[in-house]
């Protein structure tokens, strides 16, 4: 990871690395979080203290007694061997989303994989890991990792959905990626569990047929977002002889999800927003086979004269930034205040709305 913009941490360091490793501590090998620093991405200096957070993995046993836990992590759950690092611009800190293990119904450890979160202001002192995402009734398997990035004021995650039962019994071992959303990076909405954001076929011997390893650093370009991922054919692949590699998936800009009619025609009324200083509205929409019209309502839900559906100039075609227009009116004619946008969809899909000044 590059040094965050305007950060005064480590002024001569430009790159930060977090990784899982085993460290000799008093004659025994202790796994956990290690970090390193670099100016050029080639020559790295490991931090003298390691591990900064002790990790855990092992056989399915009951947790040890408190008096016998000195060699264990200070608290459970602990980090494990999948570590995704991000810079949180809202909290102004580093954040790691790591794999962890949750207990089985009978209390034994290392039953299923889940996700914990830890943060740091200086990349060295990390908070106590917090359990944030666990498999629920909608999951057929486990959650192996979470690659999180911040975009347009929200946190998005690609959850690695590993198809194994408890203690890795049953299942295919396939691992596609699910899209999840959060407003704070801690509490997550999983509205797309039934449709994978990055799917796998689970068939054939192509390098990305079975398991995808996602990244928390997608590349955002003016017209598209690029997602690079590591992959191999399956969980039990022969990593020496089977194909593996780095893949690329592309997405038109901001087209993560869409609102579209279930039966041709629909309307969506958005929450009231302040439009006093907004002089331009654009829609990211595909109306190739239909049209989109937009009208304004007051915050109380009543139509605004001159900005009704009848006055709206229809949006047609496919574009990342359709301008919203009305006959004889512009946003500058609008009295300052809070308004609702009512979007009328006719065989069209709406992906995003942008407010401009």
Where are each of the predicted segments found?
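Short, small-residue-biased leader/transition segments that mark boundaries at the very start
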Residues: 1-4, 8-15
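Carbohydrate-active catalytic/glycan-binding domains of CAZyme proteins
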Residues: 11-357
């Amino acid at each position: 990871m590059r040094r965050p913009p305007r950060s005064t941490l480590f002024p001569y360091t430009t790159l930060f690395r977090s990784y899982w490793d085993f460290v000799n501590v008093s004659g025994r090998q202790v796994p956990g979080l290690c970090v390193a620093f670099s100016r050029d991405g080639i020559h790295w200096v490991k931090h003298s203290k390691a591990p900064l957070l002790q990790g855990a993995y092992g056989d399915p046993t009951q947790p040890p007694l408190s008096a016998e836990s000195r060699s264990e992590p200070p608290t459970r759950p602990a980090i494990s061997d999948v570590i995704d690092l991000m810079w949180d611009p809202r909290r102004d800190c580093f954040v790691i989303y790591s794999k962890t293990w949750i207990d089985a119904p009978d209390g034994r450890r290392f039953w299923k994989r889940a996700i914990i979160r830890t943060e740091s202001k200086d990349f060295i002192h990390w908070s106590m890991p917090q359990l944030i995402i666990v498999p629920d009734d909608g999951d057929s398997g486990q959650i192996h990792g979470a690659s999180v990035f911040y975009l347009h004021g929200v946190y998005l995650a690609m959850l690695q959905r590993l198809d194994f039962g408890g203690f890795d019994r049953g299942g295919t071992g396939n691992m596609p990626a699910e899209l999840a959303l959060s407003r704070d990076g801690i509490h997550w909405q999983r509205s797309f569990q039934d449709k994978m954001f990055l799917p796998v076929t689970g068939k054939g011997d192509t390098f990305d047929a079975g398991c995808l390893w996602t990244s928390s650093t997608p590349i955002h370009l003016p017209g598209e977002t690029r997602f690079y991922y590591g992959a191999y054919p399956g969980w039990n692949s022969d990593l020496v002889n089977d194909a593996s590699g780095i893949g690329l998936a592309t997405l038109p800009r901001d087209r993560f999800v869409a609102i579209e009619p279930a039966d041709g025609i629909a309307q969506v009324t958005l929450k009231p927003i302040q439009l006093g200083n907004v002089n331009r509205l654009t829609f990211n929409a595909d109306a190739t086979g239909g049209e989109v019209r937009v009208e304004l309502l007051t915050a109380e839900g009543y139509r605004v004269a001159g900005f009704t559906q009848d006055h709206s100039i229809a949006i047609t075609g496919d574009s990342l930034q359709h301008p919203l227009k009305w006959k004889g009116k512009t946003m500058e004619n609008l009295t300052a205040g809070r308004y609702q946008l009512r979007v009328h969809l006719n065989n069209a899909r709406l992906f995003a709305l942008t407010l401009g000044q």
